[in-house]
């Protein structure tokens, strides 16, 4: 039988493209458990709507939700500010809007990564206009030193250097999302310098 048959095979198939692993699978799970505990404590006695920003946040949101000990509902938005590039364009387009009416709900926006903050600022303004009872952000990753707008982020997993990263929901050209860790790519894998 040919092809990829296990996660280990998949990871090995992409190994030539990986420069280095920044955050291991175990480190991610430990951090998500910690974030889940904080969220559970902060929203004790309440129901919470998790809003995932597609496509990258689906992996983070699925695992984070397993660590939150509250009644949860789920919804998704799809936005684009990258296209096929490795840096955000700053122009945000909503490709898929929410199914829920947010008015009066406690909402936690789940992001895979915060880069410049421009997309997140746009989303927060858009969602706040829908009058939720509360609106906070949980992001697995935040790139340091490149934010163009100040943002108050309540739940942050890891601060990372301003490098292009893949894995754990993050992609390059729709590849690498299901790697169980966060890694950098070799420049030749994406045409970087």
Feature locations, PLM:
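PRPP-associated nucleotide enzymes
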Residues: 1-193
């Amino acid at each position: 039988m040919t092809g990829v048959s296990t996660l280990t095979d998949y990871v090995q198939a992409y190994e030539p493209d990986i420069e280095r692993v920044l955050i291991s699978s175990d480190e991610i799970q430990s951090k998500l458990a910690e974030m889940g505990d904080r969220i559970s404590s902060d929203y004790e006695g309440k129901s919470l709507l998790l809003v995932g920003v597609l496509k990258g946040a689906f992996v983070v949101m699925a695992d984070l939700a397993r660590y939150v000990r509250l009644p949860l509902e789920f919804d998704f938005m799809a936005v684009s500010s990258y296209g096929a590039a490795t840096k955000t364009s700053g122009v945000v387009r909503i490709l898929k809007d929410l199914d829920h009416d947010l008015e009066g709900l406690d909402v936690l926006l789940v992001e895979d990564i915060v880069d410049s903050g421009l997309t997140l600022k746009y989303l927060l303004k858009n969602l706040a206009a829908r009058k939720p009872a509360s609106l906070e952000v949980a992001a697995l990753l935040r790139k340091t030193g490149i934010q163009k707008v100040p943002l108050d982020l309540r739940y942050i997993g890891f601060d990372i250097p301003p490098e292009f990263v893949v894995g754990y929901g993050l992609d390059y050209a729709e590849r690498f999302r299901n790697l169980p860790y966060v890694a950098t790519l070799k420049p030749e894998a994406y045409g970087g310098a």
